[in-house]
Amino acid sequence: IYDDVGSINSISFGYYKKLQERGIPCVTFNPFKPLISVVMNNRDHRKIFVVDGYIGFTGGINLADEYINKVKRFGYWKDTGVRIEGEAVWSLTAMFLEMWNYINRSTEDYSRFLPSVYREKEFTSDGFVQPYGDSPLDNENVGENIYLNIINRAKNYVYIFTPYLIIDHEMLICLSNAAKSGVDVRIVTPGVPDKKAVYLLTQSYYEPLLKNGVKIFQYTPGFCLLYTSPSPRDTR
């Protein structure tokens, strides 16, 4: 699955057909139509890579040369990815299949994609890992609600890498209140923008956040596209 608008400048129209001809099932999310419609704003920026149900990768890395700095479009490109093993991988598989069924109007049997062999080492952990997604199919803002909950519970610090600092009033107040309460709130944004309009909008939030004690830094070597953002972290 790839997002049609997100790939519009990098691959040819109808590229999914070429993959299908080579035996690779492929579909596009929300194909672009030259119409004025709010539906066109529904995009899928998730990156999901699952191998045999045992290993999963997610993060901000797309399939493009700038992500390995083979091509420098916006200075040095900094990104991140996470490798997951064990039961948590199933959440990534389920998110993919949910979107696959929606696009194809199909009812793919999820159980077919469960790991066929139980590997005790991979499924033994004293922690809790729960990948989650946020999509137009949801009836609530899953991602934002999780961020708000984490930030509100933080005791020591909240560190955020984000390529686009575009927040609503509730998130602005949440970050400000955390900083005022003594939590060390830091936000890192790109020093080199990939979209100037979005960059200006990002900067418009600097003043109210700084006034309330939030520390803001810019990644001057280039563009930091850590799409796992905001990624608040806290030690207790």
Protein language model regions, located:
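HKD-type phospholipase D/PLD-like phosphodiesterase module
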Residues: 1-152, 161, 165, 169, ...
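A very general structural signal that marks isolated residues within well-ordered alpha-helical segments
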Residues: 102, 164, 181, 234-235
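Helical hairpin unit composed of two closely spaced alpha helices linked by a short loop
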Residues: 164-183
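Single conserved hydrophobic/aromatic residue that forms the stacking wall/gate
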Residues: 227-236
